[in-house]
Design a protein with these regions (language model features):
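Active-site and ligand/interface coordination hotspots across diverse enzymes
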Residues: 1-53
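A short mixed-secondary-structure module that forms the rim of ligand-binding clefts
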Residues: 45-67
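Short acidic (Asp/Glu) patches
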Residues: 24, 53-60, 91-100
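Glycine/proline-rich loop-helix segments at beta-alpha junctions forming the active-site rim
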Residues: 87-173
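Residues at the starts of beta-strands that form the adenosine-phosphate
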Residues: 36, 69-70, 111, 143
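Short connector loops at secondary-structure junctions
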Residues: 69-85
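Feature marks short, surface-exposed loop/turn motifs that line or immediately flank catalytic pockets
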Residues: 46, 80, 120
Length: 173
């Protein structure tokens, strides 16, 4: 039996506001020959492009299993926070340039994955923000997916236990 050595690396890049309170995009690339995805979630929880939180790990692992090699992680709200406080003024939660980063990322990708789960069902403020964003994302509806488990067509967040190790990507339209 012979031994095989494999090497790999993940290139990280992030764009922040000048005061590091908002993150607009986090890019991760591990194989530039493979497909690209944009994953849209609710808010970033770290300002360190090298820190891998559980959500980012699950996104990378599941996309890699689905033969992707690149992801742009973007969020509906750009404020970096461990827990989203919806009592904060909308202008403090999301900077004006955030949607521009989302739209530019969507123009250069193979798949746009809506990964916010079902939060809009419990929060009217988030539902309104997502509705505004979805209007802007209309040109990309042909490559728009939600994360589902193997048993349902219910939208899931990457941290949902039922999709922790396998994503079933279902077309939105």
């Amino acid at each position: 039996m012979s031994v095989i050595e494999r090497r790999g690396s993940i290139r990280s890049e992030a764009v922040f506001s000048d005061d590091y309170t908002h993150r607009f995009i986090l890019r991760k690339e591990w194989n530039k020959e493979k497909k690209k995805a944009v994953v849209i979630m609710i808010q970033p929880n770290t300002s360190d492009p090298y820190e891998l939180d559980l959500t980012t790990v699950r996104v990378i692992n599941n996309l890699n299993r689905l033969d992707y090699g690149y992801v742009d992680l973007v969020n509906t709200y750009s404020l970096i926070t461990k827990k989203l406080n919806l009592r904060i003024n909308e202008d403090d939660l999301v900077r004006e340039e955030n949607d521009g980063y989302i739209i530019r990322a969507c123009t250069k990708t193979d798949a746009v994955i809506l990964a916010w789960g079902s939060i809009e069902e419990t929060s009217p403020k988030v539902a309104k923000r997502l509705e505004e964003l979805m209007i802007k994302l209309e040109p990309f509806k042909d490559k728009m997916y939600i994360i589902c488990d193997s048993y349902s067509r219910v939208a899931r967040h990457p941290l949902a236990p039922s999709v922790s190790s396998y994503w079933n990507l279902v077309k939105v339209y």
